[in-house]
């Protein structure tokens, strides 16, 4: 699975880890994140992420 990086703050979304603090389970692909999901560090939208 691909890792996506926030272009604003550098946070890496790793699908293997998910984002448990936001209720995103491990194994959730970036494409499957809810549209309203935001970077847990800086609050940037999904549009601010690029595939690593």
Swiss-Prot record:
Transferase as UniProt keyword: no
Keyword Iron: yes
PROSITE patterns: RUBREDOXIN (PS00202), RUBREDOXIN_LIKE (PS50903)
Domain Rubredoxin-like intervals: 1-52
Cellular component, GO annotation: cytoplasm
Stated role: Rubredoxin is a small nonheme, iron protein lacking acid-labile sulfide. Its single Fe, chelated to 4 Cys, functions as an electron acceptor and may also stabilize the conformation of the molecule.
Protein's UniProt name: Rubredoxin
């Amino acid at each position: 699975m691909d890792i996506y990086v926030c272009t604003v703050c550098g946070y890496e979304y790793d699908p293997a880890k998910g984002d448990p603090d936001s209720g995103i389970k491990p194994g959730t692909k970036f494409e499957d994140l809810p549209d309203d999901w935001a970077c847990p560090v800086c609050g940037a939208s999904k549009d601010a992420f690029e595939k690593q």
